[in-house]
């Protein structure tokens, strides 16, 4: 049975976790001599790109609208497809820019239809070793929706003990364009742009991607500027056209940024709670040492737009013998009193090296029953994509996995030649 080891005994001083500053990239960051892609830019970013190649400012509103439509409604891959854009401007655009998406390094499809893409971003400089940072995003098809789980950072700084991504060091923040491009890649793969041929999922009527959750790699509120701008692009009704009520941002509890998220993004909020006592949450979610449960829930009660129609989702991973007792369930109900909320119970998804086990199904059902009886919706999240490590808490970029394997080979006495052969095999 997995148990938590506490590093904050009652009465002891609460050490604050060091929060690593993530390197930034700008919207058009790229290596010298490499054309930047326009895919993922905001309206303002696209305007500045056009002005930069000589488009008169008086024409930019019309030109931005034209190019915007081709990128975000039609899913254009070449400027030559833009039939209502003049030949001269198309030539200028092609001389200076591309419509490239991030490279799809691998695509894995689970037995349940979940898809995971490993994406390599365009190289931007020394902080990604001129190779291009890699992230993962996941598409989860459902009966009445299709949810895309997107990443906001390369790696993560929070080191949550039950989360695979937390074992990968933080490399850098993703730009707005890199966040939006994950949705563009998904729509490409699914044939989900207007006028495209049906994708691998059969081209069902309506949009295949209906919901976005910022629950991939990284802490979104530590990259809030880019996340807010990405939500604006995703929800623009003349483009990707998602409803903001179908966009959910999950945070481990960066309390000072929560109000701004609600005011500027108007997105749905999810909280990675996972414990009802500070001493346990300090271990599971070390950020709790900086923003303990009382502060976090106070920020939730004051979240802009909070109502019964816009409830906060509290995520609670079920860990056997750690946080799954009847007493924990009753304490959870008491903590959330007065907050319009639902509680997502998440069966723990195992990953190599984890010290935890998933609660027994009977225990999960009992926990859910207690919460539901108290008046809170308490669905048990169906694990999706476990067989391809695409489920909640399992994402970790392939680059980091390969580096870890290389270190292990060297520690076992295998030479550099063997490591190189393994990496390129």
Curated annotation (Swiss-Prot):
Keyword annotations: 4Fe-4S, Cytoplasm, Disulfide bond, Iron, Iron-sulfur, Metal-binding, Methyltransferase, rRNA processing, S-adenosyl-L-methionine, Transferase, tRNA processing
PROSITE patterns reported for this sequence: RADICAL_SAM
Disulphide-bonded residues: 149-392
SMART domains associated with the record: Elp3 (SM00729)
Annotated function: Specifically methylates position 2 of adenine 2503 in 23S rRNA and position 2 of adenine 37 in tRNAs. m2A2503 modification seems to play a crucial role in the proofreading step occurring at the peptidyl transferase center and thus would serve to optimize ribosomal fidelity.
Cofactor(s) needed by this chain: [4Fe-4S] cluster
Binding site for S-adenosyl-L-methionine: 218-219, 250, 272-274, 349
Any one of the GO BP annotations: rRNA base methylation
Cofactor binding description: Binds 1 [4Fe-4S] cluster. The cluster is coordinated with 3 cysteines and an exchangeable S-adenosyl-L-methionine.
Major location (coarse): cytoplasm
EC number: 2.1.1.192
UniProt-recorded name of the protein: Dual-specificity RNA methyltransferase RlmN
Catalytic activity from the UniProt record: adenosine(2503) in 23S rRNA + 2 reduced [2Fe-2S]-[ferredoxin] + 2 S-adenosyl-L-methionine = 2-methyladenosine(2503) in 23S rRNA + 5'-deoxyadenosine + L-methionine + 2 oxidized [2Fe-2S]-[ferredoxin] + S-adenosyl-L-homocysteine; adenosine(37) in tRNA + 2 reduced [2Fe-2S]-[ferredoxin] + 2 S-adenosyl-L-methionine = 2-methyladenosine(37) in tRNA + 5'-deoxyadenosine + L-methionine + 2 oxidized [2Fe-2S]-[ferredoxin] + S-adenosyl-L-homocysteine
Pfam family, one: Radical_SAM
Taxonomic classification: Bacteria, Pseudomonadati, Pseudomonadota, Alphaproteobacteria, Hyphomicrobiales
Cellular component terms (Gene Ontology): cytoplasm
UniProt keyword Transferase, yes or no: yes
Boundaries of every Radical SAM core domain copy: 142-381
Compartments where located: Cytoplasm
Encoding gene, per UniProt annotation: rlmN
Family to which this protein belongs: Belongs to the radical SAM superfamily. RlmN family.
Molecular function terms from GO: 4 iron, 4 sulfur cluster binding; metal ion binding; rRNA (adenine(2503)-C2-)-methyltransferase activity; rRNA binding; tRNA (adenine(37)-C2)-methyltransferase activity; tRNA binding
Residues that coordinate or bind [4Fe-4S] cluster: 156, 160, 163
Signal sequence bounds: none
Catalytic residues of the enzyme: 136 (proton acceptor), 392 (s-methylcysteine intermediate)
Miscellaneous remark of the record: Reaction proceeds by a ping-pong mechanism involving intermediate methylation of a conserved cysteine residue.
